[in-house]
């Protein structure tokens, strides 16, 4: 019967013996809005017709309604949502609320990328889709792409990538690949990316990254099981370099293709030491970036700002996030 459970990954999803997958979170969607929300308008655009994949673009209303002939050029944020590679979308109320707040606070253009999720589409599909989206975004660099908002308003000398949890993991890998594959013309820089923001990044390893990381068997087993479901073909499990970015000696961060990095961690997040470890490893590498910051929110857990976006600490996170994009000191 369809009600027979094969695997229970609550609170994320349930897999039934029939093969049906029931996602328990992140399936509700909200439409984009041409009516300003917090001073921001949005619309959805297809970036991969072959796979029927879209992204949501956010633009400050004042830029959208500017009557001057000279287009208003703004920093460009490309955002990858979290959800363990398993749940959530770029169109959920959670991410629509966050991106609207971030764009309002930072006065930027934002592209929120939707990608195919595991287990139906295991790793590396999410990376492949994200790369396709990033290339689509950069097709507008000369002002002649298919999307007018990017042609008119995106300043490609100020491109920022960001994401939370699994989206932060994707952000890291896209930035490495952008430098390696020379995403941008050399007239800007080879990667085309000015900076990245990793919010509560989902990195992991079979053994603790330091003596402060949790050794709780249940917690470690759960985190590893999420990765195993997302990437069943990883021969090294959670020591796969896709997830074991911090501890793995095979991962060289010196090639990170950006000049500025902000790592945001939360004190009570099981992933907190991975975020600190990334910051430390990058700082000790031969990376030639200019800015490397880490911010820890005390007393809060994983993606607390998405669960309670109206809290004071969530507002502080958005303020710091936006300040990094604006170049605030």
UniProtKB/Swiss-Prot annotation:
InterPro entries listed in its UniProt record: AB_hydrolase_3, AB_hydrolase_fold, Carboxylest/Gibb_receptor, Lipase_GDXG_put_SER_AS
Disulfide bonds: none
Entry superkingdom: Eukaryota
Motif Involved in the stabilization of the negatively charged intermediate by the formation of the oxyanion hole boundaries: 81-83
GO MF annotations, alphabetized: carboxylesterase activity
One GO term describing the cellular component: cytosol
Any Pfam family matching the protein: Abhydrolase_3
Annotated positions of the N-acetylmethionine modification: 1
EC numbers: 3.1.1.1
Record keywords: Acetylation, Hydrolase, Serine esterase
Enzyme class, spelled out: hydrolase
Reactions catalysed: a carboxylic ester + H2O = an alcohol + a carboxylate + H(+)
Organ and tissue specificity: Expressed in flowers.
Keyword rRNA-binding: no
Active site: 165, 269, 302
Function summary: Carboxylesterase acting on esters with varying acyl chain length.
Family of the protein in this entry: Belongs to the 'GDXG' lipolytic enzyme family.
Name this protein carries in UniProt: Probable carboxylesterase 13
Organism of provenance: Arabidopsis thaliana
Lineage, top ranks: Eukaryota, Viridiplantae, Streptophyta, Embryophyta, Tracheophyta
């Amino acid at each position: 019967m369809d009600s027979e459970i094969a695997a229970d990954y609550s609170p994320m999803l349930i897999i039934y013996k029939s093969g049906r997958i029931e996602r328990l979170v992140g399936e509700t969607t909200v439409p984009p809005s041409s009516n300003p929300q917090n001073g921001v308008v949005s619309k959805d655009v297809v970036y991969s017709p072959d796979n029927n994949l879209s992204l949501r673009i956010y633009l400050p209303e004042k830029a959208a309604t500017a009557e001057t002939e000279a287009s208003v050029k703004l920093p460009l944020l490309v955002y990858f949502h979290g959800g363990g590679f398993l749940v959530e979308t770029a169109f959920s109320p959670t991410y629509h609320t966050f991106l609207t707040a971030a764009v309002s606070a930072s006065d930027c253009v934002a592209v929120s990328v939707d990608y195919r999720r595991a287990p139906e589409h295991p790793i590396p599909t999410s990376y492949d889709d994200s790369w396709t989206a990033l290339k689509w975004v950069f097709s507008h660099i000369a002002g002649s792409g298919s999307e007018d908002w990017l042609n008119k308003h995106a300043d490609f000398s100020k491109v920022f990538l960001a994401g939370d949890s699994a989206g932060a993991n994707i952000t890291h890998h896209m930035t490495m690949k952008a430098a390696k594959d020379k995403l941008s013309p050399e007239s800007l820089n080879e990667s085309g990316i000015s900076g990245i923001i990793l919010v509560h990044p989902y990195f992991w390893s079979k053994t603790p990254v330091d003596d402060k990381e949790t050794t709780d068997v249940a917690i470690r087993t759960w985190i590893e099981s999420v990765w195993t479901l997302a990437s069943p073909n990883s021969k090294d499990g959670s020591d796969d370099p896709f997830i074991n970015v911090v501890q793995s000696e095979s991962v060289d961060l010196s090639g990170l293709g950006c000049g500025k990095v902000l790592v945001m961690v939360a004190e009570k997040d099981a992933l907190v030491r991975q975020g600190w470890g990334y910051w430390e490893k990058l700082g000790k590498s031969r990376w030639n970036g200019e800015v490397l910051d880490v911010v820890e929110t005390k007393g809060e857990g994983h993606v607390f700002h998405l669960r309670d976006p109206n809290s004071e600490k969530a507002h502080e996170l958005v303020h710091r996030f936006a300040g990094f994009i604006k170049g605030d000191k």
